[in-house]
From Swiss-Prot:
Highest taxon listed in the record's lineage: Viruses
The protein's name in its UniProt record: Putative poly(A) polymerase catalytic subunit
CDD domains in alphabetical order: polyA_pol_Asfar (cd20924)
Lineage: Viruses, Varidnaviria, Bamfordvirae, Nucleocytoviricota, Pokkesviricetes
Catalyzed reaction equations: RNA(n) + ATP = RNA(n)-3'-adenine ribonucleotide + diphosphate
Localization in the cell: Virion
Length: 475
């Protein structure tokens, strides 16, 4: 029997070869150079894989092989007009089949030439665009890795987002590798912050909500401490917060008493339908905050409790103690990063808690290693699958069979309804939640006879109200 030749499965190597041998490789490279000059001129901010790669280049590392064709993803405070302008520039320079189309991600416009995508421009509200930290690599502005972390945590928080290529299958491994590189080369310094704590008591529903924010940190810390005692590990010396909590419950409610920072005494909960829960709890809605990019959802505030909406999403959760529902550590990390971005005055406090949560995960990992050595593989698997400290696909339930409805799905459904002129039944869950597709950006193809679209309004479309602005409630 003849032996098979050993095959080199270096995917990156063959991708580079394929790119260089494409029939239109020269034209694509020329178009990408035009895009690069446009980014520099407009002072747009690169994000995503290319921003991570360039940030790592500044530290002598990378995630992409040298010479790989750049995939330009960029933030812009005026992404629609910028995308149209870039398309016009490419067309005027003689490139063929130039077009700008709305991407699946509704806040993104894609620019192509010769049916090859050369740029993705995503919307970032001016109040965020003008304040986020950046680095510079070869005259290109790139988003700082501190901000990039948020996008990496996001995939772990909503494992079933982006069907049929759910994040649990398409992003978990890649994003974990990228996060570890960012943590290695751009760690967030630990700067202790002294806080005054006060004991607060809250009564909350048992099944409809997940405990979030500083209270979730307290529950995860004490759960870690109990696991340490079980493993007979000496108490750790740490500068990180060590808040305590207690609770009792009945069939419907939990009474939770927890140490909270005096500066942030409100309890934070995550729930699929905040307005319904607020009504059932008999609370008074005082303020509503719009999303902060993809990193914080709409927030519904009452005097003592703030509700983070998970509407249209399936949030990963942890179960601790006697079936207490807590957000996953990844969502908690995202919360502390969001707090650092959105409230500069307390940035140091939120980053301290961010590092404290990372410390909890690090210590939990060491305890899990001990348990793994002391138990059979089957026993350890069962234990790990119920641990609140590992990545999970356990999600917060909603009131209908399906919970994940991305903006792209709702836009597609709205288009179907508009074309068929048949409204959804009033009993349909999304009957009052379809976007007005007439307010979305239009596709544009220079040289095709139609004028460039004008007067797109960010204010008139709720899908673009993502600057984190809070307004008093009329309720």
């Amino acid at each position: 029997m003849s032996s098979l030749l050993k095959t080199d499965f270096n995917v990156s190597k063959y991708r580079l070869i394929a790119q260089k041998r494409e029939a239109n490789a020269v034209e694509i490279e020329a178009a990408l150079e035009v895009v690069r000059e446009f980014i520099i001129k407009k002072k747009l901010i690169l994000y995503g894989g290319i921003a991570i790669d360039y940030a790592l280049h500044l530290k002598g590392s990378s995630i992409y092989p040298e010479g790989e064709r750049p995939d330009f993803d960029m933030f812009s405070p005026n992404h629609v007009e910028d995308a149209y302008e870039l398309a016009d520039i490419l067309y005027e320079k003689g490139f063929k089949q130039v077009g700008t189309v709305r991407a699946i991600h509704v806040q993104t416009m894609r620019v192509r030439t010769d049916f090859v995508w050369v740029a993705d421009l995503s919307y970032m509200p001016p109040n965020i665009f003008n304040t986020i930290p950046t680095l510079t690599y070869k005259n290109l502005k790139i988003i700082h890795p501190d901000y990039q972390r948020a996008g990496l945590h996001l995939a772990f928080c909503f494992p079933f987002d982006n069907p049929p290529r759910e994040d649990v299958f398409s992003r978990f491994k890649k994003d974990l590798q990228r996060y570890n590189l960012i943590e290695k080369y751009y760690p967030i310094p630990v700067v202790p912050v002294k806080s005054i704590y006060e004991s607060k008591t809250f009564s909350i529903p048992f099944k409809q909500v997940a405990i979030h924010g500083f209270a979730a940190y307290a529950l995860l810390y004490q759960t870690l401490n109990e696991l340490r005692i079980t493993c007979k590990v000496p108490e750790w010396k740490t500068e990180f917060p060590q808040p305590s909590y207690s609770y009792h419950k009945n069939d419907k409610n939990i009474t939770l008493t927890v140490d909270m920072p005096k500066a942030y005494p409100a309890l934070v909960l995550a729930t699929y339908n905040p307005e319904e829960v607020i009504k059932e709890m008999g609370l008074h809605l005082t303020e509503i905050c719009e999303p902060y990019m993809d990193y914080s959802p709409p927030i519904f505030k009452t005097n003592d409790i703030h509700f983070f909406s998970t509407m249209f999403k399936e949030l990963a959760i942890s179960i601790i103690q006697d079936n207490l529902i807590v957000v996953s550590p990844q969502y908690l990390l995202l919360y502390f990063l969001y707090g650092a971005f959105a409230t500069p005055a307390d940035k140091s406090l939120f980053l301290f808690y961010y590092n404290a949560t990372l410390w909890i995960l690090e210590k939990a990992d060491s305890l899990l290693n001990i348990i793994q050595k002391q138990t059979s593989p089957e026993e350890f698997t069962r234990f790990a699958n119920t641990s609140p400290f590992v990545l999970t696909t356990r999600v917060l339930s909603c009131s209908q069979e399906r919970c994940t409805f991305s903006p792209a799905y709702r836009i597609s459904l709205a288009n179907d309804v508009q074309q068929s002129q048949l409204p959804l039944p009033k009993t349909h869950f999304l009957s009052n939640s379809l976007p007005d597709v007439s307010t979305l950006p239009y596709n544009y193809y220079p040289g095709k006879g139609k004028d460039r679209p004008t007067n797109f309004s960010y204010e008139k479309n709720l899908l673009f109200n993502i600057g984190g602005k809070c307004t008093p409630s009329a309720m």
